[in-house]
Swiss-Prot record:
Function of the protein: Essential for nitrogen assimilation, distribution and remobilization within the plant via the phloem.
Any further remark recorded for this protein: Plants over-expressing ASN1 have increased content of free amino acids (mainly Asn) in flowers, siliques and seeds.
Gene designation: ASN1
Domain Asparagine synthetase: start-end pairs: 193-516
Protein name: Asparagine synthetase [glutamine-hydrolyzing] 1
Source species taxonomy: Eukaryota, Viridiplantae, Streptophyta, Embryophyta, Tracheophyta
Amino acid sequence: MCGILAVLGCSDDSQAKRVRVLELSRRLRHRGPDWSGLYQNGDNYLAHQRLAVIDPASGDQPLFNEDKTIVVTVNGEIYNHEELRKRLKNHKFRTGSDCEVIAHLYEEYGVDFVDMLDGIFSFVLLDTRDNSFMVARDAIGVTSLYIGWGLDGSVWISSEMKGLNDDCEHFETFPPGHFYSSKLGGFKQWYNPPWFNESVPSTPYEPLAIRRAFENAVIKRLMTDVPFGVLLSGGLDSSLVASITARHLAGTKAAKQWGPQLHSFCVGLEGSPDLKAGKEVAEYLGTVHHEFHFSVQDGIDAIEDVIYHVETYDVTTIRASTPMFLMSRKIKSLGVKMVLSGEGADEIFGGYLYFHKAPNKKEFHQETCRKIKALHKYDCLRANKSTSAFGLEARVPFLDKDFINTAMSLDPESKMIKPEEGRIEKWVLRRAFDDEERPYLPKHILYRQKEQFSDGVGYSWIDGLKDHAAQNVNDKMMSNAGHIFPHNTPNTKEAYYYRMIFERFFPQNSARLTVPGGATVACSTAKAVEWDASWSNNMDPSGRAAIGVHLSAYDGKNVALTIPPLKAIDNMPMMMGQGVVIQS
């Protein structure tokens, strides 16, 4: 992930202002250590910190159209850029960067081109012909982005809060699936799929449709000009990503450049569930597996850095971000610049253990909708910023637009958890990849129970965090918590501890308002807490809080596999510019 910063219409074109923009842009250099760029046109500034993943030699930013009247700075990957270039035959491209198409698409179609992009992105585009600008963020919010306003009438854009919090009177999270246009004078929603209105869909479950859609999502993300790998915890989601990647890597441009054997990475405390399962899956798939161990003290020592980089005080996010943060540093030290990760499946398929309590399919579906819409505040934030802290890019195939639309059009009855019928959480996904003739995964991995990342790395990790917080936050501090922190008042010592650190780095009221709050149990939304009366007094975000559902063992012995597996899909047509895509 790159880092972008823009200051637009600040009524100051002085050298001092340029120096200030450069200074603020350097706060984002961890995201893009490969190159820095700054474009100035009057009182408009576009800065870029580049992580070179596509076309490292010539793709430096900002990028331009032919006559350089349109300028764009982008953080993202446009997976269909080759297809889009074919639609822009009258345009001359200067680089091989996937992001250059944005300037030309705007020139050809105006502001409404954003839905044509298939990828993850945040960008700022300046049209010097009339001094107008637009800003856009991807559909789900995989890339992080903030918008702020100065007292001088300026508009500020930054990949991270730390790029603008000291210079803006007010700032907020830029909403996913929207663009902001100076011509329109505000935001416009460009991503509005049918499932957004939360009405219950009725498409029958077709396992092969799910399989094809997800394989396509993984394959298109193999577009890279640098070494890459997969994050492999040994759970269902990361294991499927690894399995599909391993199957389709051969013959791609990436394999020709970096070799056909996939590298996988796992992190955990000694003896943790993830380390054991990750190693087993890696051996099954034949990956070059890298296992990273950390201690509870290692994690505690990193908490301040994690909060500074991830920019949140949300308990669940910090718990899970810390091991990912530590692992990302190790991965980058090996020369890897991009990883595939498994975020998003639990939101789409109702994979969290509390979904066992969903009273009906309408409630189940509406909760998945709420969870997906909030992903940019939680797992997307974690995956993006804990990796970007070390100049590592995370790609998340479960959050592919086409795949989400396929999965969210299903009748939610098929997603509901019914253990008596052998249907555990994410059953429809497991069933889609249960192939007897060409198995994707061993059965007990395919049907391994859900572990939240912060649990799977080792149960003593969360217990250690709670103990450490208790040593730093006393009862008197908790009794005054509502006065000290009237917004999102911390209700545990662990939450109070994180909040104190956050406020040191980001003391502005705008900053604290960017962090979500409300009742939760086992990662639920506040609405889902109503599903079980016993949850109202148990506000632990850990998956273990789903009392009566969580199994500490993960060997699959408690799962009834009563559903016959699918037959292999033979002789499916495949095509892709740099690899293969399975056509539906």
